[in-house]
């Protein structure tokens, strides 16, 4: 159906401007019901979109700042691979204090998603100790030595409790104001050990002690290497994962 599906949000619904940052999706600012919003068109399955939409609604009810699905005229969360979400104001984190606020927000996300089901088709880092594939990850495409290093990093997370992790808390996906921290772009969100989020933060923002920080940083670097393999960023992240 493509962008023609935008008409399901009303006769006046229209695309405004293409937005940067969408790798797996076509992302635009849109106007729906006279309000600015964001439209995202991609190839995700209905089950995947339902998981994400349900999560975002739950986070909104829990008081976390994140995009919220805008329903079609007939009450659907998405249609034809298109999801429309509220526009989130704010800028990226710049200071160490900003990043500490991000860490607090991620911990709030982890607290309110206990028992959340796994995103359809995804696997956690500890699942990949034995599995070879899971949505964005294909360990068979990596050199065997790289797989050994990644699995050694993830093995240190074995037995930990799992929650929903954002999966990609980089500055482009964070919108700060003086009042709150919002997380956008939930494409990489799934159920995993919270260390994957916390280990990705700069400046020691998560406040972990030395050993815990090392475990989190190694696991996060291994995850990003595997998810992005094999672009230059993935190679860079793999270089941060210690050899076994």
Sequence positions of predicted segments:
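ATP-binding glycine-rich phosphate-binding loop
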Residues: 9-31
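Catalytic-loop of the protein kinase fold
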Residues: 164-166, 171
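A glycine-centered beta->alpha junction motif in the catalytic cores
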Residues: 81-95, 131-139, 222-236
């Amino acid at each position: 159906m493509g962008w023609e599906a935008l008409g399901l949000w009303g006769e006046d619904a229209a695309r405004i401007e293409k937005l940067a940052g969408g790798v797996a999706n076509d992302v635009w600012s849109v106007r729906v019901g006279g309000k600015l919003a964001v439209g995202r068109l991609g190839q995700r399955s209905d089950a995947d979109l339902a998981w994400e939409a349900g999560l975002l609604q739950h986070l909104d009810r829990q008081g976390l700042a994140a995009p919220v699905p805008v329903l079609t005229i007939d009450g659907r969360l998405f249609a034809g691979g298109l999801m429309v979400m509220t526009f989130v104001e704010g800028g990226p984190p710049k200071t160490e204090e900003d990043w500490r606020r991000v860490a607090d927000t991620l911990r709030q996300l982890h607290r309110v998603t206990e028992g959340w089901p796994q995103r359809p088709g995804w696997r956690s880092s500890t699942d990949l100790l034995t599995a070879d594939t899971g949505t964005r990850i294909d360990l068979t495409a990596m050199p065997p030595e790289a797989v050994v290093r990644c699995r050694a990093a993830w093995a240190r997370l074995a037995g930990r409790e799992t929650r929903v992790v954002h999966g990609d808390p980089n500055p482009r996906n964070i919108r700060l104001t003086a009042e709150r921290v919002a997380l956008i772009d939930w494409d990489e969100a799934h159920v995993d050990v919270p260390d994957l989020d916390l280990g990705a933060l700069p400046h020691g923002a998560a406040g972990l002690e030395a050993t815990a920080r090392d475990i989190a940083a190694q696991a996060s670097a291994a995850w990003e290497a595997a998810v992005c393999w094999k672009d230059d960023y993935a190679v860079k992240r793999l270089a941060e994962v210690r050899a076994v």
